[in-house]
Amino acid sequence: MSLDKGTKEEITKKFQLHEKDTGSADVQIAILTERITELTEHLKRAPKDHGSRLALLKLVGQRRRLLDYLNSTDTKRYQTLINKLKLRR
């Protein structure tokens, strides 16, 4: 379950720090959050899809590590991002 190009560009434009920013932690976390949301919806329809469930757990772990990194380097940006994405942390 990957994101289509248009969705990815839209998320990138919304969360980028400057015009050419495509790889900052903010953008990566936002893209991972969208992928996690899509996989969660997929797993509601197909609860026996264990491969997707494992992929979901991997993505959640990756997002958690990026959030921890952002929190340790720039707490204000971390809080802003969590509020924008409506994450429970």
From Swiss-Prot:
Coiled coil: none annotated. This is Small ribosomal subunit protein uS15. The keyword Ribonucleoprotein applies. Belongs to the universal ribosomal protein uS15 family. It holds the Pfam family Ribosomal_S15. PROSITE patterns: RIBOSOMAL_S15 (PS00362). Part of the 30S ribosomal subunit. Forms a bridge to the 50S subunit in the 70S ribosome, contacting the 23S rRNA. NCBIfam families: S15_bact. Keywords: Ribonucleoprotein, Ribosomal protein, RNA-binding, rRNA-binding. One of its GO terms (biological process) is translation. One of its GO terms (molecular function) is structural constituent of ribosome. The gene is rpsO. The keyword Transmembrane does not apply. The lineage of its organism: Bacteria, Pseudomonadati, Chlamydiota, Chlamydiia, Parachlamydiales. One of the primary rRNA binding proteins, it binds directly to 16S rRNA where it helps nucleate assembly of the platform of the 30S subunit by binding and bridging several RNA helices of the 16S rRNA. GO terms for cellular component: cytosolic small ribosomal subunit. It comes from the Bacteria.
